[in-house]
A protein has these predicted regions:
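Short, solvent-exposed aromatic-acidic interface loops
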Residues: 90-94, 124-131
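Short beta-edge strand/loop motif at the mouth of beta-sheet-based domains
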Residues: 32-73, 165-168
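A conserved amphipathic terminal alpha-helix motif
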Residues: 127-168
Length: 168
């Protein structure tokens, strides 16, 4: 395998530390998903109105849209509040839903308590080798500026906003 091919398969890893307990961080990441996920990031055909993560193993990850449609983008593979969630990323390189879990990559999120009541959120997007085409493009998209790093910054901003407002 060439160095370029190996890099295309390498997992994307991002982390952020937030001023919240693991319970609060987990809840905001999952149950309050719509409050921080940008409505520009979806695979639906109409403008997005809401993002939803169903909190259970086998639960759907999907978006609702202005035309009444829903667009699935993932399935919960592991649900262990408040420490861990594993999601099948069912988006192919052409940004269409991939129904076959064997062809889907995975996003694992871990919530670890650290000093002063804070939580480190570690995200790993892996399994790109399962995708049938467009591996390098997908990895570049989720690892790039508009990918997981920027999304975790939005998540952290939401956590901080809730903490300032006393909502958390």
């Amino acid at each position: 395998m060439t160095a370029m091919a190996e890099q295309a398969l390498e997992a994307v890893r991002k982390s952020v530390t937030v001023s919240a307990s693991p319970e609060e961080a987990f809840e905001i990441f999952t149950e309050d998903f719509d409050s921080w996920w940008p409505h520009t990031h979806h695979i639906g055909k109409a403008p997005m109105t809401k993002g939803i993560i169903e909190g259970r193993r086998g639960g759907r990850c999907y978006t609702e849209h202005e035309d009444g449609s829903e667009a699935d983008w993932g399935t919960i593979l592991a649900w262990e509040p408040p420490r861990h969630v594993l999601i099948a990323w069912q988006i192919a390189a052409n940004w269409q839903f991939e129904p076959d879990l064997k062809k889907s990559s995975e996003v694992e999120i871990r919530f670890t308590p650290v000093e002063n009541g804070k939580t480190r959120v570690d995200l790993e997007h892996r399994g790109f080798e399962r995708m049938t085409a467009g591996v390098a493009e997908m990895r570049a998209a989720v690892g790039g500026e508009g990918g997981w790093g920027g999304l975790l910054e939005l998540f952290a901003a939401r956590v901080e906003h809730k903490a300032r407002k006393g909502e958390a």
